[in-house]
Design a protein with these regions (language model features):
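Helical substrate-recognition/capping region of FAD-dependent monooxygenase/halogenase enzymes
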Residues: 17-225
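Extended, hydrophobic alpha-helical segments in both membrane/secreted and soluble proteins
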Residues: 1-16, 27, 38
Length: 225
């Protein structure tokens, strides 16, 4: 079910942009580029599991009832394994790093979100004196979102992208810094999130031309005059 939901979501936001005239139909080509590799990995895994489950050999029976059950019970004692299992089953760990929609302007240290990854769930302050909020609850899944960390706000909106892009400047704050460190998000950095929450473009200091060029190139549209 999770796979079907992700298939639908991946196609839905792209189709919405095309139907509304904000993107060229070529954007839809990225659906197969992103989702077919996921489907192949899933089928490979489920095929192996199915063979083990239906096999009537004694070895397979021992693996099912003794070995795998004990190994799973032991592994679930560890927080890291539980988190990995959750990400695998929920499929929020799926990434599109090889997608034509993924571009990185900087190389991050191990653990940092990369272009193509689903951006991590954060609870942060979006205003200096504001409350701690759920970042994903603030995101509009009909537009792109530009997240700025450890750098000042834009002096003006990125020209021509008002209807496609929302900018969020995350203020410097001890609680924010702790949350960003927990998710290995470097500062300064910027992340351009697609409507589905995956990272489309990432870098250190904001490059306005790169952001504008990314949207124009991937959506095959021209900035509004």
């Amino acid at each position: 079910m999770n796979t079907g939901l992700q298939d639908a979501y991946n196609l839905a936001w792209k189709l919405a942009l095309v139907v509304s005239g904000r993107a060229d139909a070529s954007l839809l080509d990225s659906y197969e580029a992103e989702r077919i590799p996921v489907a192949k990995r899933l089928l490979s895994t489920t095929d192996r599991a199915f063979v083990l489950i239906v096999s009537d050999s004694r070895v397979a029976g021992l693996l099912r009832t003794r070995v795998l059950a004990n190994v799973a019970a032991f592994a679930m004692r560890f927080d890291r394994i539980r988190k990995l299992a959750f990400r695998t089953i929920s499929q929020i760990g799926i990434e599109y790093r090889d997608s034509p929609l993924s571009e990185a302007l900087a190389r991050w240290h191990e653990g940092a979100p990369r272009a193509g990854d689903r951006f991590p769930w954060l609870r942060i302050k979006l205003q200096p004196d504001g409350p701690v909020e759920d970042l994903f609850a603030k995101l509009d899944d009909k537009r792109f979102h530009l997240l700025l960390f450890g750098q000042p706000a834009l002096s003006a909106e990125i020209r021509g992208l008002r209807d496609l892009l929302v900018t969020h400047v995350v203020p410097s704050d001890p609680a924010n810094d702790k949350e960003l460190a927990r998710q290995h998000i470097p500062q300064p950095s910027f992340y351009l999130l697609r409507p589905d929450g995956h990272v489309g473009l990432s870098g250190t200091q904001l490059d306005v031309a790169a952001v504008s060029g990314y949207v124009s190139d991937r959506l095959r549209m021209h900035a509004a005059k």
